[in-house]
A protein has these predicted regions:
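Beta-sheet-dominated interaction scaffolds and their linkers
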Residues: 39-71, 111-113, 182-199
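A short beta-strand micro-motif common to beta-rich folds, especially ectodomain repeats
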Residues: 63, 126, 137-148
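Short proline/glycine- and polar residue-rich coil/turn motifs
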Residues: 114-121, 233-242, 274
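N-terminal signal peptide c-region/cleavage motif recognized by signal peptidases
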Residues: 32-34
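Short, surface-exposed loop/turn segments at beta-strand-coil junctions that are enriched for proline
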Residues: 129-135, 249-256
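Short, acidic/polar linear motifs in exposed loop/turn regions
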Residues: 69-71, 132, 204-208, 222, ...
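Surface-exposed binding patches on compact interaction domains or structured appendages
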Residues: 40-46, 69-126, 213, 220-226
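A short tyrosine-centered beta-strand micro-motif
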Residues: 139, 143, 257-268
Length: 286
């Protein structure tokens, strides 16, 4: 496949602004370890919490953790800062604490540690108190759950039992309605093995958190619409840049494109009066 010259622009004539309901969101991170993690089976719900709040407001939310395995597990719950990599992967290691959009100091988590028996569940609650006079914007925090085996060995407890698996519930807290400002800075094609993705790079220069929506349209040389693919619903953090990857060819998902020359048009709604629109050319070889 060959990517030809591209065009990225805003289309003011196609789409009027739709209000975007902002709240607090949660995404998940699961880390596997070879031995103990293989014996642990847990379910955390919800994995995304979206909240809208105002300065000085408070709320309490619940998260359910279920032990679907055959052995008791020990669960730790801690408030954590996090960020997104450019490809959208949640990042916890090396993230600066108390950044400009951190809400971690606003929350308290209880209980901090508990044992869950097989086929049982526990409820972890967090209380969030928004500071008075906080500036409007899209803030974030998370509750990180660490899972490990249960031991009654005092020596092992003294060494602090290794926690082998982690899942994070990501929490987005939207305060007010700051003005939205974003642009599509690039549109490219990424080939990975048998998969082909169209990748739009979006820069959010505002203080607002939004989620993307939209459509990729594939046109043949005659201008005929041969396929429409929805843009993934992914978070766009304040004052950040990220890639939005749209799968076009994926044999595992039975997505194929016949050989030929195509025009690719991507339209993304981020809550602006106009859609973000990018165009590029795609050549599919035999």
């Amino acid at each position: 496949m060959d990517l030809q010259p591209r065009l990225v622009h805003a289309d003011c004539s196609v789409h009027a602004q739709h209000p975007v309901v902002l709240a607090a969101a949660v995404a998940a991170l699961l880390m596997h370890a070879p031995s103990a993690a293989a014996q642990i089976s847990v379910e955390v719900s919800p994995l995304r919490i979206e909240l809208t709040a105002g300065p000085g407001s408070t709320t309490t939310q619940a998260i359910t953790v279920a032990n679907a395995g055959k052995d008791p597990i020990r669960v730790r719950a801690v408030a954590t800062d996090w960020d997104l990599a450019k490809d959208g992967a949640p990042q916890f290691e090396g993230v600066a604490e108390g950044g400009p959009y951190s809400a971690t100091s606003w929350i308290r988590v209880a209980p901090p540690e508990q044992v869950i028996e097989p086929a049982k569940e526990m409820t972890v609650r967090f209380s969030l108190a928004v500071p008075p006079g906080i500036q409007a914007g899209g803030y974030r925090t998370g509750v990180l759950f660490e899972f490990g085996p249960v031991t009654t060995n005092p020596a092992a407890r003294g060494r602090d039992v290794m926690f082998k698996s982690r899942i994070a519930t990501l929490i987005y807290v939207s305060i007010g309605q700051p003005a939205m400002a974003a642009e599509m800075t690039d549109l490219g094609v990424r080939n990975t093995g048998t998969q082909t993705q169209v990748v739009a790079t979006i820069r959010n220069s505002s203080r607002r958190y939004v989620r993307t929506r939209g459509t990729l349209v594939l046109y043949d040389q005659s201008g005929r619409n041969v396929r429409e693919v929805p843009v993934p619903d992914v978070p766009l953090l304040p004052e950040s840049e990220r890639e939005v990857a749209i799968s076009l060819v994926d044999p595992d998902k039975q997505l194929t494109v016949a050989p030929g020359d195509y025009k690719v048009e991507v339209r993304i709604d981020v809550g602006l009066p106009a859609l973000l629109v990018g165009e590029t050319s795609l050549k599919v070889l035999k």
